[in-house]
Curated annotation (Swiss-Prot):
Catalytic activity line of the entry: (2S,6S)-2,6-diaminopimelate = meso-2,6-diaminopimelate
Protein name: Diaminopimelate epimerase
Pathway: Amino-acid biosynthesis; L-lysine biosynthesis via DAP pathway; DL-2,6-diaminopimelate from LL-2,6-diaminopimelate: step 1/1
Gene behind the chain: dapF
Enzyme superclass (EC): isomerase
A Pfam family per the record: DAP_epimerase
EC number: 5.1.1.7
Lineage of producing organism: Bacteria, Pseudomonadati, Pseudomonadota, Alphaproteobacteria, Caulobacterales
């Protein structure tokens, strides 16, 4: 049986979104990889192409509109995705003709509300800041952990902050925005460092002003992406913890910007950004699990 999907993106961070309220979806890692593989016109192969696959399941608890699952393009299920969360919130609000919505994920309950035309604000909850919440392989102060890349006496990057936003993040603060090549080389190296038993998303944050961060993120299981919502949240939290930014800041990617607030009253991280609907399609029969 064929299955409909929606192709969406948040600042170019793109998703294949599958509604599973009436038709259950239990894909293998291989099937997720087949969906996420980007088309190659030269070789005449590839799937739909995306950074993550998202399934919107029936709710499992009172007060939620859905239960949402996320997979990285390598086929591994992940706990959270900030840009994907905004896309899901927008879809649920559109279908329910509501201005706000709540839904559950493996990382906990998230909520969203309309902030304008295809602009969504999402409450990402409280960040995990303890070493075993990231998790790290050993106890460390997550404001700045003992990690560096490069020569001991002249490291390229060092002493990053660590934050969990339902998925693990490490954030290096850099004096100037890094190149894609640097982010790929360093990010792929740090992603699988023994300090991170579950792997890690790697951010490179340049503080342009107290209300402005320029960010590039190497995503665990997906590689270098146009934008990363949880990465933006993690960068802002890590920066505030070091006294580098105020509680509200614009986090800028090359593809656009998100507004991130680490709310002092309750410690919740609030993300506001755009949602883009690209197209509707049908999954190939072989991956319509």
């Amino acid at each position: 049986m064929s299955r409909t999907f929606l192709k969406m993106n948040g600042l170019g961070n793109d998703f294949v979104v599958i509604e599973t309220l009436t038709q259950p979806f239990h894909p293998t890692a291989e099937e997720i990889r087949a969906i996420a593989k980007r088309p190659n016109a030269k070789e005449g192969e590839g799937g739909i192409g995306c950074d993550q696959v998202i399934a919107i399941d029936p709710p499992r608890a009172e007060g939620a509109s859905a239960y949402v699952r996320f997979w990285n393009s390598d086929g591994e299920e992940t706990g959270a995705c900030g840009n994907g969360t905004r896309c899901v919130a927008w879809l649920l609000m559109q279908s329910g003709q509501k201005d706000s919505v709540a839904f559950d994920t493996v990382a906990g309950r998230l909520s969203g509300k309309m902030a304008g035309d295809k602009l969504v604000t999402v409450d990402m909850g409280q960040p995990g800041l303890a070493w075993n919440q990231i998790p790290l392989a050993e106890e460390m102060d997550t404001v700045g952990i003992e990690l560096q890349v490069g020569p001991i006496d002249a490291p390229l990057v060092h002493t990053p902050g660590c934050v969990s936003m339902g998925n693990p993040h490490v954030v290096f603060f850099v004096d100037a925005p890094v190149s894609d090549a640097f982010a790929r080389g360093t990010g792929s190296l740090v992603e699988h460092h023994p300090l991170f038993p579950e792997g890690v998303n790697v951010g490179f944050a340049h503080i342009a002003a107290r209300d402005h961060i320029k960010l590039k993120v190497w995503e665990r299981g997906a590689g270098l992406t146009a934008a990363c919502g949880t990465g933006a949240c993690a960068a802002q939290v890590a920066a505030v913890r070091r006294g580098l930014t105020d509680r509200v800041a614009k986090v800028e990617f090359e593809s656009g910007a998100l507004t991130i607030e680490w709310r002092e009253a309750d410690g919740h991280v609030i993300m506001t950004g755009p949602v883009t609907m690209e197209f509707v399609g049908k999954l190939p029969e072989k991956v319509a699990a």
